[in-house]
Amino acid sequence: MLYFLTGITASGKSDLAHKSAIENNMSILSVDSMAVYKGLDVLTAKPSDVMQAQVKYYGLDIADCDQNFSIIDYLNYLIDQDIPEKSFKEDILAVGGSGLYVKAMIDKYEFKPTDPTIRSELEQLNFDQLLKFHELNEIPIPDMELNKIDYISSSFERP
């Protein structure tokens, strides 16, 4: 079965998940969009080598820091690791704060690949230009994402 433990940054999710996984003989699936990157151990509060020896972890260190790793790549990783199938045979605790990763798993999102031409054009725009473009095209931006230029840029690439 697949269980979820989500919450805000620095709320103790990782420690609670690790303790729960040991007590309940579970594996852990990281749903942290930064933990996928190698070398960001301190920034993302990745489990230590000792912790990883105690519990099977998925979703850690699967991309280089200079690699563009998208939600599509993450979902493909889940399929490559047989996570959907494994969740029928074993208990897996998905833990992290990346809401899009969690929603994509629960709601079975399907994403279209990004268009590199559009992305290149959008990267030339500044923050105010992107906001104006959103307004003109009536593309909503959640209030909590208004300060994230990457979110605003990538929203033009989504269907």
Regions flagged by a language model, labelled:
Residues 1-159:
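Phosphate/pyrophosphate-binding catalytic cores of soluble transferases and nucleic-acid-acting enzymes
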